[in-house]
């Protein structure tokens, strides 16, 4: 059942905090893989199922009727994020008229329910625990930084400078190839304005930015 209110969603998220993955999976009749090598998205799927998310990988938010996106965030023993966070695929073509205000990235990040999860590899997957939920909305200053990065990165795409894009660009957002392998090509714009085959690119939040969100929450300013 999909939660009908923000309060109901938060209550569900708080109810699973502290559970081991094995306990939660068992209650949902989901098998636990031995590790995440072949099942990279399993943790996200486990949490989505537990909370009743509906969108899957569609462009809309996970809880579209509440205007909330769901993100699992693996952290280490010190409470620091272990990986970057995928936000959405970048539009490599037909991006005329796309602005920050009507972008998928802004839409997805307008309100996020972060679910912290233990992510250290030495902890067996079944023994890892679900952590606290954090309901977050970007501050005006955070949105400004996101917008600045998004506009800079989109400029590279629209000007056909795909080969110049690398993971060092952007202070809080980065663009990286998104695909299981290099055979998963899509269409993009080349440097002379021609259509080319290229790797799909995804927008990711840097670990430093998600660490800042966690810090904000711990200090009670989030």
From Swiss-Prot:
Domain of life assignment: Bacteria
The keyword Ribosomal protein appears for this protein: no
Gene3D superfamilies: DNA mismatch repair MutH/Restriction endonuclease, type II
Major place of residence: cytoplasm
SUPFAM superfamilies in alphabetical order: Restriction endonuclease-like
Annotated InterPro entries: DNA_mismatch_repair_MutH, DNA_rep_MutH/RE_typeII_Sau3AI, DNA_rep_MutH/T2_RE_sf, Restrct_endonuc-II-like
Ribonucleoprotein is among the record's keywords: no
Family from the record: Belongs to the MutH family.
Protein task: Sequence-specific endonuclease that cleaves unmethylated GATC sequences. It is involved in DNA mismatch repair.
Record-given protein name: DNA mismatch repair protein MutH
Gene assigned in the entry: mutH
């Amino acid at each position: 059942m999909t939660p009908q209110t923000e309060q109901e969603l938060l209550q569900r998220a708080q109810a699973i905090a502290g559970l081991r993955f094995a306990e939660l999976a068992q209650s949902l009749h989901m098998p636990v893989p031995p590790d995440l090598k072949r099942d990279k998205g399993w943790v996200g799927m486990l949490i989505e199922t537990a909370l009743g998310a509906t969108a899957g990988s569609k462009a809309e938010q996970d809880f579209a009727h509440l205007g909330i996106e769901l993100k699992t965030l693996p952290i280490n023993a010190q409470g620091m994020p272990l990986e970057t966070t995928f936000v959405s695929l970048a539009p490599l073509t037909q991006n005329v008229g796309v602005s920050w205000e009507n972008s998928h990235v802004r839409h997805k990040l307008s309100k996020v329910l972060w679910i912290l999860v233990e992510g250290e590899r030495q902890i067996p997957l079944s023994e890892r625990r679900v952590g606290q939920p954090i309901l977050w909305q970007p501050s005006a200053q955070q949105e400004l930084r996101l917008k600045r990065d998004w506009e800079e990165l989109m400029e590279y795409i629209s000007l056909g400078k795909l080969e110049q894009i690398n993971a060092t660009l952007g202070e809080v957002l980065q663009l990286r190839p998104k695909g299981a392998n290099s055979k998963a090509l899509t269409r993009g714009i080349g440097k002379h304005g021609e259509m080319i085959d290229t790797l799909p690119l995804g927008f990711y939040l840097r670990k430093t930015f998600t660490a800042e969100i966690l810090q904000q929450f711990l200090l009670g300013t989030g």
